[in-house]
Amino acid sequence: MKIIKELILGTVLILTLGAVAIYSYHTYHYKKASRDILYQLSNQLIVKQGLNEKMSTHLVFDTLYVDGNISKNDDKVLSEIIENHIIPVRTISINSGGGDIETAINIGSIIYDKGISIEVRRLCLSSCANYLFPAARNKIINYGSIVGFHGSPNSDDSKLITTVDGVTTSDPAIKDKIFSEIRKTDKLFYNKIHVSWMMPLCGQNENIGDPDTGLSTYNEKDFAQFGVKNISYTDGEMVWKKSMDIMGIPFAHYCKEK
């Protein structure tokens, strides 16, 4: 009789554990599918906001939400918000396609000096990736969000295709005039935040950038070799890397300073 009871209890326990496992499995995949659907539905709008010509901001407690490209004087706008907000700004939640280099460097310096963290909500490309992202105390990369590099003022002359304000140019005389000072400023900034100035260049030097945008990114290990640390991923690095593969964003590798 005792043996029969033990067998019954064992069977019930196995069935219970099996039911819990099946429920957990379906719940996980349901949540993941729901998240993926919501991501796809919101993706177009979020990207559009990140590429807006004019930057927009709003505050929620200690988080400053920033959307749109970086233009001249945006550093002054952000500085005023940060300095005058009663609650100290702890995090900047960014969604930006990049923009004006000098302004981005100034914003990066503000982030570094204030010890502000950054959350990449969807896009942090070009000058946003070059200067805002590495300057932050902590870096949080959301699901499917891109930290994309495609060069800097210190790119090889043959690959230097954008001016300080983001306007494309191929005139060597113009490039030399515009970039002579900004190249120095670029290196001084990286020296200040203890990050290698080669970070934006390695993917470009490997010629592995996305065919349409020239963008590439790095995994956590390569970021750390440049000096970019304290990175976390909302869904883990492996899930994030898979999302980059799906979107066709290649991973560059660490390279040493010239």
Description of each model-found segment:
Residues 87-103, 117-123:
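Short, glycine-/small-residue-enriched flexible loop/hinge segments at domain edges that mediate gating
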Residues 8-23:
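Hydrophobic membrane-insertion alpha-helices, especially the h-region
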Residues 157-254:
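Charged, glycine-interspersed solvent-exposed loop segments at helix/strand-loop junctions
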Residues 66, 92, 133, 223:
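Terminal peptide-recognition signature
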Residues 35-77:
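STAS-typified acidic loop motif
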Residues 57-68, 91, 163-171:
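Acidic/histidine-rich, surface-exposed loop or edge segments in extracytoplasmic proteins
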